[in-house]
Amino acid sequence: MPRQRHYYGLNHLHFITASIYRRARLFDSDRFRGQFVATLAGLRAELSFKIIGYVLMPEHFPALIWPSERADPSRIVPSLKERTAKFIPKNLQAHRELPWCGRMLAALTLPPTVHLHGPYRVWQRRFYDLNVWSEKKRLEKLNYMHGNPVQRGMVTSPDKWPWSSFRFYFLGDDSVLPMDRLL
Protein backbone atom coordinates (compact mmCIF):
# COMPACT_ATOMS: atom_id res chain seq x y z
CA MET A 1 0.00 0.00 0.00
CA PRO A 2 1.53 3.37 -0.97
CA ARG A 3 2.17 5.95 1.70
CA GLN A 4 -0.20 8.88 1.94
CA ARG A 5 1.11 12.11 0.46
CA HIS A 6 1.59 14.94 2.98
CA TYR A 7 1.32 18.63 2.19
CA TYR A 8 3.13 20.80 4.69
CA GLY A 9 3.15 24.53 4.77
CA LEU A 10 1.88 27.50 6.66
CA ASN A 11 -1.87 27.94 6.90
CA HIS A 12 -2.56 24.21 6.73
CA LEU A 13 -4.51 22.64 9.57
CA HIS A 14 -3.60 18.98 10.17
CA PHE A 15 -5.54 16.14 11.75
CA ILE A 16 -2.98 13.77 13.24
CA THR A 17 -3.28 10.46 15.04
CA ALA A 18 -0.59 8.38 16.73
CA SER A 19 -1.11 5.01 18.42
CA ILE A 20 0.58 3.16 21.24
CA TYR A 21 2.60 0.10 20.21
CA ARG A 22 0.38 -2.99 19.98
CA ARG A 23 -2.57 -0.74 20.87
CA ALA A 24 -1.68 -1.14 24.55
CA ARG A 25 -4.03 0.87 26.77
CA LEU A 26 -1.29 3.01 28.26
CA PHE A 27 -3.51 6.05 28.64
CA ASP A 28 -5.87 4.26 31.00
CA SER A 29 -3.53 5.74 33.60
CA ASP A 30 -4.11 9.31 34.80
CA ARG A 31 -0.38 9.53 35.51
CA PHE A 32 0.55 8.88 31.88
CA ARG A 33 -2.29 11.01 30.54
CA GLY A 34 -1.07 13.91 32.66
CA GLN A 35 2.54 13.43 31.63
CA PHE A 36 1.56 13.21 27.96
CA VAL A 37 -0.50 16.42 28.11
CA ALA A 38 2.30 18.25 29.95
CA THR A 39 4.79 17.10 27.30
CA LEU A 40 2.46 18.20 24.50
CA ALA A 41 2.00 21.63 26.13
CA GLY A 42 5.76 22.05 26.57
CA LEU A 43 6.44 21.09 22.97
CA ARG A 44 3.78 23.54 21.79
CA ALA A 45 5.53 26.34 23.70
CA GLU A 46 8.92 25.34 22.31
CA LEU A 47 7.92 24.94 18.66
CA SER A 48 5.14 27.58 18.53
CA PHE A 49 2.48 25.41 16.90
CA LYS A 50 -1.20 25.63 17.80
CA ILE A 51 -3.43 22.91 19.20
CA ILE A 52 -6.98 23.36 17.96
CA GLY A 53 -8.48 20.16 19.37
CA TYR A 54 -7.56 16.79 20.82
CA VAL A 55 -8.78 13.78 22.72
CA LEU A 56 -6.64 11.35 24.64
CA MET A 57 -7.93 7.80 24.25
CA PRO A 58 -6.58 4.70 26.04
CA GLU A 59 -4.37 3.58 23.15
CA HIS A 60 -4.07 6.57 20.81
CA PHE A 61 -4.48 10.29 20.46
CA PRO A 62 -5.95 12.31 17.61
CA ALA A 63 -5.40 16.06 17.45
CA LEU A 64 -5.92 19.05 15.20
CA ILE A 65 -2.75 21.11 14.98
CA TRP A 66 -1.74 24.28 13.16
CA PRO A 67 1.99 24.09 12.39
CA SER A 68 4.38 26.99 12.82
CA GLU A 69 7.24 28.23 10.70
CA ARG A 70 9.53 26.26 13.02
CA ALA A 71 7.73 22.94 12.92
CA ASP A 72 5.33 20.94 10.78
CA PRO A 73 3.76 17.57 11.73
CA SER A 74 6.82 15.69 10.48
CA ARG A 75 8.77 17.32 13.31
CA ILE A 76 6.05 17.79 15.94
CA VAL A 77 4.78 14.21 16.15
CA PRO A 78 8.20 12.48 16.21
CA SER A 79 9.39 14.95 18.88
CA LEU A 80 6.32 14.23 21.00
CA LYS A 81 6.73 10.49 20.57
CA GLU A 82 10.45 10.61 21.35
CA ARG A 83 10.00 12.65 24.54
CA THR A 84 7.20 10.52 25.90
CA ALA A 85 9.00 7.30 24.94
CA LYS A 86 11.86 8.28 27.26
CA PHE A 87 9.91 8.67 30.48
CA ILE A 88 7.13 6.10 30.07
CA PRO A 89 9.28 2.91 30.22
CA LYS A 90 11.31 4.33 33.13
CA ASN A 91 8.13 5.08 35.03
CA LEU A 92 6.70 1.63 34.30
CA GLN A 93 9.94 -0.05 35.38
CA ALA A 94 9.98 1.91 38.64
CA HIS A 95 6.52 0.53 39.42
CA ARG A 96 6.79 -2.87 37.73
CA GLU A 97 5.62 -4.65 40.90
CA LEU A 98 2.16 -3.19 40.30
CA PRO A 99 0.17 -5.59 38.09
CA TRP A 100 -0.94 -2.92 35.61
CA CYS A 101 2.62 -1.60 35.14
CA GLY A 102 3.91 -5.14 34.64
CA ARG A 103 1.28 -5.79 31.96
CA MET A 104 2.14 -2.54 30.18
CA LEU A 105 5.86 -3.34 30.21
CA ALA A 106 5.11 -6.76 28.74
CA ALA A 107 2.95 -5.20 26.01
CA LEU A 108 5.66 -2.68 25.10
CA THR A 109 8.56 -5.17 25.13
CA LEU A 110 10.22 -5.79 21.79
CA PRO A 111 11.43 -9.22 20.69
CA PRO A 112 15.18 -9.67 21.42
CA THR A 113 16.04 -9.56 17.71
CA VAL A 114 14.82 -5.97 17.30
CA HIS A 115 16.39 -4.20 20.30
CA LEU A 116 17.89 -1.44 18.19
CA HIS A 117 17.11 1.46 20.52
CA GLY A 118 16.23 -0.34 23.73
CA PRO A 119 13.99 -3.17 24.85
CA TYR A 120 10.72 -1.18 24.72
CA ARG A 121 8.68 0.55 22.06
CA VAL A 122 6.01 2.96 23.21
CA TRP A 123 4.62 4.16 19.87
CA GLN A 124 3.79 2.56 16.57
CA ARG A 125 6.31 3.77 14.00
CA ARG A 126 4.12 5.87 11.75
CA PHE A 127 1.40 8.39 12.42
CA TYR A 128 -1.66 9.42 10.43
CA ASP A 129 -1.74 12.94 9.04
CA LEU A 130 -4.56 14.52 7.04
CA ASN A 131 -4.66 18.06 5.70
CA VAL A 132 -7.87 19.78 6.78
CA TRP A 133 -8.76 22.23 4.04
CA SER A 134 -12.26 23.36 5.03
CA GLU A 135 -14.27 24.53 8.01
CA LYS A 136 -16.67 21.63 7.41
CA LYS A 137 -13.82 19.10 7.72
CA ARG A 138 -12.44 20.89 10.82
CA LEU A 139 -15.81 20.62 12.57
CA GLU A 140 -16.16 17.00 11.43
CA LYS A 141 -12.81 16.13 13.03
CA LEU A 142 -13.58 18.03 16.24
CA ASN A 143 -16.95 16.27 16.53
CA TYR A 144 -15.30 12.91 15.85
CA MET A 145 -12.70 13.50 18.57
CA HIS A 146 -15.18 14.81 21.13
CA GLY A 147 -17.59 11.94 20.47
CA ASN A 148 -14.94 9.21 20.58
CA PRO A 149 -15.06 8.58 24.39
CA VAL A 150 -18.87 8.34 24.24
CA GLN A 151 -18.83 6.05 21.21
CA ARG A 152 -16.37 3.75 22.99
CA GLY A 153 -18.58 3.61 26.10
CA MET A 154 -16.05 5.31 28.37
CA VAL A 155 -18.45 8.11 29.37
CA THR A 156 -22.10 8.96 28.75
CA SER A 157 -21.46 12.44 27.33
CA PRO A 158 -18.39 14.30 26.02
CA ASP A 159 -18.34 16.75 28.94
CA LYS A 160 -17.61 13.84 31.30
CA TRP A 161 -14.23 13.10 29.64
CA PRO A 162 -11.62 15.58 30.95
CA TRP A 163 -8.91 14.56 28.44
CA SER A 164 -10.49 16.34 25.49
CA SER A 165 -10.84 19.80 24.01
CA PHE A 166 -14.64 19.49 24.35
CA ARG A 167 -14.52 20.97 27.86
CA PHE A 168 -12.52 23.95 26.59
CA TYR A 169 -14.95 24.75 23.79
CA PHE A 170 -18.26 24.04 25.51
CA LEU A 171 -17.59 24.57 29.24
CA GLY A 172 -14.80 27.14 29.14
CA ASP A 173 -12.57 24.72 31.08
CA ASP A 174 -8.90 25.01 30.15
CA SER A 175 -7.55 23.29 33.26
CA VAL A 176 -6.16 20.24 31.45
CA LEU A 177 -4.84 21.73 28.19
CA PRO A 178 -5.86 25.15 26.86
CA MET A 179 -6.65 25.23 23.16
CA ASP A 180 -5.47 27.79 20.65
CA ARG A 181 -8.00 29.60 18.53
CA LEU A 182 -7.68 30.11 14.81
CA LEU A 183 -7.77 33.76 13.81
Segments from the language model and where they lie:
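Short catalytic/metal-binding and nucleic-acid-binding patches
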Residues: M1-L183
